């Protein structure tokens, strides 16, 4: 299967540059994966499609202010770090810009010297492992001097950083938001719970690999970046009991979907665990846990459009995307939503 099989033509002006005023008033395309039938709704109408006894699975990660602007110790040359993932303790994998010359031993300073970093290793794709040095609590320093990194296709400044967090975000660690969840309000979640829908959580810390283009033509050769995930016992219990009672498992976002498919056994049973996943889901994949998916509209030729194509079929997805373009839906992180039922 070729990467170019997942291309569609998207006018630039349909890339949403800011969120809609009220989270649950974004548009919602409902796609029936069996029949291909499409309905046009508002996101708040999602309650019509989720039944008592179904289980909604949300990713409760929180985006960290992962962009750091600083300078090289000694020369004062400007540098930008983007934190990708914590390897252990104070060692992180980072993207450096400009970073070609940063050899092991190179040192950088951020925020009036309250945070320092030393390159300890060059890793794949030119990223660096760095060790941070500081007094106090790393997360608090990051909150003070870091910037939330918006996706490269969003050029407008975000007035309210909380709009790039889900209302249920809890565990800090992502370089990008799990954007399907941005449409939910607390009131909408309460309404679903009141209707007898179970709400379960997983954690997957989203890396910037989610925006990386697929560089191979045969997608079977593509290797995903690994991302940290965790699923707890109480959430496994909700998911497993839903399955046993004939309810549907509805993943909110490709990140939740990837966790569930990573941890599910051949019978669709999930067990509490944590680790790193590099699962790559594309057409031909047989889903073990996930029945339905709430997601945004994804970039052409991205691993995310491949994942939704695995669930609904490539032709149905590309047809739905072409209709979304005609109907002037808003695309990508701050855009509208799709429910694949």
From Swiss-Prot:
Its EC number is 2.4.99.17. InterPro entries: QueA (IPR003699), QueA_dom1 (IPR042118), QueA_dom2 (IPR042119), QueA_sf (IPR036100). Its main location: cytoplasm. One of its GO terms (biological process) is tRNA wobble guanine modification. GO terms for molecular function: S-adenosylmethionine:tRNA ribosyltransferase-isomerase activity. It is an enzyme of class 2 (transferase). The keyword Cytoplasm applies. It catalyses: 7-aminomethyl-7-carbaguanosine(34) in tRNA + S-adenosyl-L-methionine = epoxyqueuosine(34) in tRNA + adenine + L-methionine + 2 H(+). Transfers and isomerizes the ribose moiety from AdoMet to the 7-aminomethyl group of 7-deazaguanine (preQ1-tRNA) to give epoxyqueuosine (oQ-tRNA). Monomer. This is S-adenosylmethionine:tRNA ribosyltransferase-isomerase.
